Each structure stands twice: as C-alpha cells, then as structure tokens.
Amino acid sequence: MGLSFTKLFSRLFAKKEMRILMVGLDAAGKTTILYKLKLGEIVTTIPTIGFNVETVEYKNISFTVWDVGGQDKIRPLWRHYFQNTQGLIFVVDSNDRDRVVEARDELHRMLNEDELRDAVLLVFANKQDLPNAMNAAEIIDKLGLHSLRQRHWYIQSTCATSGEGLYEGLDWLSNNIASKS
C-alpha cells in the first residue's frame, strides 16, 4: 500500500522533463521566445549560429528547449537534434509573407524524418503585433497543416516581445506530450 501511494504521489508531484526542439526560418523569433520564457524579459539577439539550449521551468515541468539557428546554410544540421525530441516548436514570422512557402517546405521536410514521427507539433505564429501579420487560419493554410493527418499539432498566435501566447503554447505542449507518455 505504501509503495503504491509513493508511486502515485511521485507521479502527481514529481517534476516532469520534456525535450523540446524549437526551429524555424532565421529571424522568426526563436531566440527571443526562448529567453522570454527563460528570463521573462526581452534580450538583444544576434543570428544564432549553432544553438542555444535552456531549461524552462513551468507548472512542475522542466522543458529542455533547444533553439537551433535557422539560416539556410545551417538548416541541414537540424536533423542532429531530432533524437529523443518529444515536442517540436516551429516558429513562423507571421509578417514574412515572402518566405512562408520556404517555411512550409522546411517544416514538411522535417516532419518526414523518422526520428520525429512521435513528436507533437506546436506552431508559434509569431509577430502577431505587426499590422500585416497573417492570422493563425492563414498560417494553417499556407503551411499545409491540415494535410498532417497522422500528426498531433496545434497553432498558437504569439508575440515574443510581449510574451503573449507563449505560455498557452507550453500548456498545450505539456498536456499533449504527457498524454502520449
């Protein structure tokens, strides 16, 4: 009896750990999102060559978030981060209409990788504060998200600089990764 109570207690109250990979085209806002979540403030960023990794604590969950540079020359390196990824955050600059097709192509290329077959997908439609930003419905269409029949996905409108939508996205991730394990 004592052992089963201990198991139940630890399941309810032990910190859960989740491995998250955050990718997207360059200048989409990945690093700004990472440090807004980690520090609660806006940091001055430069283009990420390589990666940033931080642990973000939220609601008894420890998210290890890998923010990988998005410049086209380093995108082939993304696959080196796929192993053991439970959740994929794909960040889209909602104001960048010129490169949304490029974003779609990169997203679908990644989702076809065997190592990511079980990862849930959260799309952050970032930069919603800009006047010409595409809304979530438009991003869903442009990224072809409805064609993802076998993939559990969600889109969250965000503004990295204000933090709007970021924690709602983490809530969805934690609920959906937890339900798969």
Curated annotation (Swiss-Prot):
It holds the Pfam family Arf. Its EC number is 3.6.5.2. One of its GO terms (biological process) is vesicle-mediated transport. GO terms for cellular component: Golgi apparatus. PROSITE patterns: ARF. It is found in: Golgi apparatus. The keyword Repeat does not apply. CDD domains: Arf1_5_like (cd04150). GO terms for molecular function: GTP binding; GTPase activity. A lipid is attached at G2 (N-myristoyl glycine). It catalyses: GTP + H2O = GDP + phosphate + H(+). Keywords: ER-Golgi transport, Golgi apparatus, GTP-binding, Hydrolase, Lipoprotein, Myristate, Nucleotide-binding, Protein transport, Transport. It comes from the Eukaryota. It is an enzyme of class 3 (hydrolase). Belongs to the small GTPase superfamily. Arf family. GTP-binding protein involved in protein trafficking; may modulate vesicle budding and uncoating within the Golgi apparatus. NCBIfam families: small_GTP. This is ADP-ribosylation factor 1.
